[in-house]
Amino acid sequence: MRRLAVAISALLACTPALAAQTTIADGALRTAAQLREQALADTTGFAVVESLTTEVGPRIAGGEADPRAVAWAKAKFQSLGFDKVWTEPVSFPKWQRRSEQAAVIGAHAQPLHITALGGSPGGTVEGEVVRFENLAALQAAPAGSLAGKIAFVDYQMTKARDGKDYGNGGAVRSKGPSEAIRKGAIGFVMRSAGTDSHRVPHTGITRFDEGVTPAPAAALSVPDANQLARLTALGSTRVRLALDCGWDGTATSYNVIGEITGRSKPKEVVVIGGHLDSWDLGTGAIDDGAGVAITMAAGHLIGQLKQAPKRSIRVVAFANEEQGLYGGKAYAAAHGKDAKDMALHQIGAESDFGAGRIYAFNTGSAAPDASRAATRQIAEVLAPLGIAYEPSKGGPGPDVGPISAKGGAWAWLAQDGTDYFDLHHTADDTLDKIDPKALAQNVAAYTVFAYLAAEADGDFGSRAKSVQPPSE
């Protein structure tokens, strides 16, 4: 009898854990499958990115087009039928690009195709170029060895579906200028953090370490980096770099938010979005007009249902991601203040890796175990789109990162980025690079995910924690 009592007690002890498992009802799964097929045939996503890139164009944070982009986003949310539309201010330092030139001087005189790195100061410098194969080689250079010279880091990125080598290419851009200056350099140039063979350089933000006096810093197009490498192999090569750019006070932009109100738990939200800003060279189609369009279209399709999902779908067009995740940080500060806020954050996902087809899915949080069943259910509805469930992979998108760092649950919808760094941060980032069918597949995936996450009977593990958001 005692053994039976112990067994019953053990069973009862397990019951709360079983009850806490997050699952999704069959009816919601059927609705999601219908939404998936509807999204594949829908053209809203492409129409939205076409509108943004055509009517607004390049939209560097704090620039002339920034307020036009904000007005565009508000109007687009309203025209797509979102129940609520509002803005939240985001302030940041303002950086401007005006002109940029570089040239080899001397016996082999010729122009070089370059672009200033975001955050670079203006100025004209001229000096002998010293080539380094990678960042580690620059870091190993003796102190003072670059006095009066221009450092050239020639790291060549390789293509990958997940873009994993961007960690190395991006590190050259973010750390290289400060490292060069510490060695005595008067300027810095790098092979673009890209995988293309076109004569279009890739920009991107750089940071100068505290105590370092900033110097002009620029990226060469890939062919120009090859040319400069050949010239330095021939012997001493001098370059003149002339940049007119720099910081100019502060600016205020806005996170633009559209919401489909939930039917029974309207204060609990599923957050999806992309960043509204872009660099100023192209029209920001893949980075990140596509992400804005994908998530706006997903919210729109869910909003057309006769019955709204249980929780609200919140689509955020984030401000100034490119220069330091300012929009994501501001969102986390406003909506992740305490445990009560975090309890209302069901889950979040950002589309910010172009418009290639989504091939993998996962979710994560501070307490993920109870939501594994629901994650698998979502994955089953995504599977016909060619999307695999990868339970040990993934992470939050850039602008979702700050609220995830505070304990918010995240979803990972991995896009094929094989060709992403051919275009990233270049003048070639234009609408014609987007495949409408691939974009529709993205819309279908985000629609399924957002709807089912909003319909789940339980949460995905958001738990408040005292962790600082990532810096960029």
Located regions from the model:
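Second-shell loop/turn segments in exported
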Residues: 32-40, 54-64, 116, 127-132, ...
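Soluble metallo-hydrolase cores and metallopeptidase-like ectodomains found primarily
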Residues: 29-31, 106-143, 206-285, 297-300, ...
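N-terminal capping segment at the start of a domain
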Residues: 24, 29-63, 200-208, 277, ...
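Short helix-loop-beta-strand segments that form the rim/entrance of peptidase-like active sites
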Residues: 47, 301-326
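Noncatalytic luminal/extracellular "stalk/propeptide" segments of secretory-pathway proteins
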Residues: 22-30, 50, 54-162
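Extracellular/luminal Protease-associated
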Residues: 63, 112-216, 283, 389
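Active-site-adjacent substrate-binding region
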Residues: 181, 187, 191-192, 251, ...
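Metal-dependent peptidase/peptidase-like ectodomains
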Residues: 107-109, 122, 127, 217, ...
